[in-house]
Regions:
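Short hydrophobic beta/alpha edge segments that flank linear recognition/processing sites
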Residues: 55-68, 91-99
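Generic detection of short hydrophobic beta-strand segments and adjacent strand-loop junctions
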Residues: 32-34, 71-73, 104-109
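N-terminal, Lys/Arg-enriched amphipathic/low-complexity engagement segments
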Residues: 1-47
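Acidic, glycine-anchored pre-beta loop/turn
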Residues: 48-54, 83-86
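A generic structural signal for short beta-strands and their flanking turns/coil linkers
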Residues: 30, 73-75, 91
Length: 134
């Protein structure tokens, strides 16, 4: 027989003391890579070149078949390297992050006041559209 314990209406475990109130400093990497292979069905077209400055949210890649579908930069910084594989296939775009984060301003919107086309346009322009899976 297994030792299963069935709980009804929860279980209070008396633990003495309180949680330590401390936070850890976040660690942000120096170099971020945007990999087109992470986005299924995307045929990437490069929109930046080495040495270009990018802001978080600015487009880095676009789809060749649907140019309105964009992949945006997750950090602000400088494009340090464009890595290509066999037959010049685009493998990754490396971005060297700068000290502070600067963002592209897409404005604030209330979803209830927007039409479906406006929501779709905002998702396409700001980048999260490529992460949606149907």
């Amino acid at each position: 027989m297994s030792n299963n314990i069935d709980l009804k209406q929860g279980l209070n475990i008396p633990i003495s003391g309180a949680a330590v109130q401390k936070t850890r400093k976040t660690v942000s990497p120096d170099v971020i890579a945007v990999k087109p292979t992470d986005f299924k069905g995307l045929t990437p077209r490069l929109l930046v070149k080495e040495g270009d400055k990018v802001l978080a949210g600015s487009p880095v890649l676009a789809d060749k078949k649907n140019p309105e579908i964009l992949v945006t930069s997750p950090v602000s910084g400088t494009v340090s390297e464009v890595v290509r594989g066999e037959k010049r296939k685009l493998l990754e775009v490396k971005i060297k992050a700068d000290g502070q984060q600067e963002y592209v301003d897409f404005g604030t919107h209330k979803a209830s006041d927007m039409s479906a086309d406006e929501v779709k346009e905002l998702l396409l322009k700001s980048g999260p559209w490529v992460s949606l899976v149907q």
